[in-house]
Amino acid sequence: MTVRVLNVWWDGRIVGQFTQDRHGDIGFAYSEAWLDDENTLPLSASLPKRAEPFSRRECRPFFGGLLPEESQRLVTAQALGVSPANDFALLDRLGGDVAGALQLLPEDQEPIEAGPLPDQQPTPLDEAGIVRILDALPTRPLLAGQEGLRLSLAGAQSKVPLVLIDGELALPVSGQATTHILKPPIARFPGTTENEAFVMRLAAAIGLDVAPVEPRSANGRPFLVVERYDRYRDADGVVHRIHQEDFCQALGVPPETKYASEGGPTFKDCFELLRRVSARPATDVLKLLDAAIFNLVVGNADAHGKNFSILYDDQGPKMAPLYDLLSTVAYPDLSPKMAMRIGKRVTLAEMDADGWQTFAKEAGVGLPLVRRRITNLVDSTAEAVARVLEDTSDLYIDSARINHFADSVAGRAKLVRLSI
């Protein structure tokens, strides 16, 4: 078996080569042209530009972090007929459209030239077509194996990237940059579509930077449509990819250890990362601070290192909009413990003034600032809950369930205020 190669493309240029040798070991090396151009960026904060190739241990957190996780990875691999542990084989089949600006393609392929979306003639989906996708995702995550589709997204939840044209969802043509993500409900937990839509819109209502979401349904089947923040459409209607990486990728942490309790990033690690990488660290530190407080208020205990990202746009690296915000405490079968401790506290019941003092030190900010952010965010959340419910009540299939979520958030907001 010879060395297998995937060219890593970024905006029409080869960044380098992702390889797998005859022993199954993966590696990555930047191309000479990419290294010689002082205007090019590294793929990741964990993969600085250098001539020496990167080993499996060094490059796997980034490349493995482009793929689905946990059961989604297993079922995807089964659908493709490859080993779930084989990152190269999975990216060979799925790497045509991933999170960020990259495309991973075989040596004999090049990216298609971008053009206005309608000119590329993606396949439109009627309600029956959407239902077919919803039915297929449990056994074929990301529609893995469907001819012409090479799509990947990280995460343990079922989802598939699509394009949106004039408000209508469509399957992309081969190599086309997707613009939105369709997320079906999580089968084990009722109401996750309504839950995530409400929490994401609540975050937007109080001024947090979040990915826009829209709850929809097809033949009575609910799903969520999330706008991709790592894409932009120019004046001619051409969709461009923007590079991004999650905090685990940036810190060189494999997706299997994304939780802080397993060696994954802590909030201290995340704040230090932003100060090191961000072009506007003061702004982004406050953005992460607010996100931590908001997640405690709404009961999103699953905010681990892969649920925060860095976006590399033309203004420099910055913290990406928030995504995957869900009130996980609404489901008794899920652990109420926060994925990343806040000042050594893992639940709202444990949170106290000493916890906030420790958290302020981890964030590298003063306790008075943390208290002001808590007060402002709690007050804004309490005021916005009813307004968000009223403004979006017609979008939710299960209004009783979303009212329950809203009541829970309002109650938690009061407890967070008392904890300071």
UniProtKB/Swiss-Prot annotation:
What GO molecular functions are on record for this protein? protein serine/threonine kinase activity
Keywords attached to this entry:
Kinase, Plasmid, Transferase
Entry keyword Kinase: yes
Q: Which Gene3D superfamilies match?
A: 1.10.1070.20
Q: Which residues form the active site?
A: 302 (proton acceptor)
**Enzyme class at the top of the EC tree:** transferase
**What Enzyme Commission number does this protein have?**
2.-.-.-
Entry-linked InterPro entries: HipA-like_C, HipA_N1, HipA_Ser/Thr_kinase
| GO cellular-component term (any) | cytosol
One of its Pfam families is HipA_C
List, alphabetically, the NCBIfam families matched: couple_hipA
UniProt family annotation: Belongs to the HipA Ser/Thr kinase family.
- This protein's name: Putative kinase Y4mE
Q: Which organism is it from?
A: Sinorhizobium fredii (strain NBRC 101917 / NGR234)
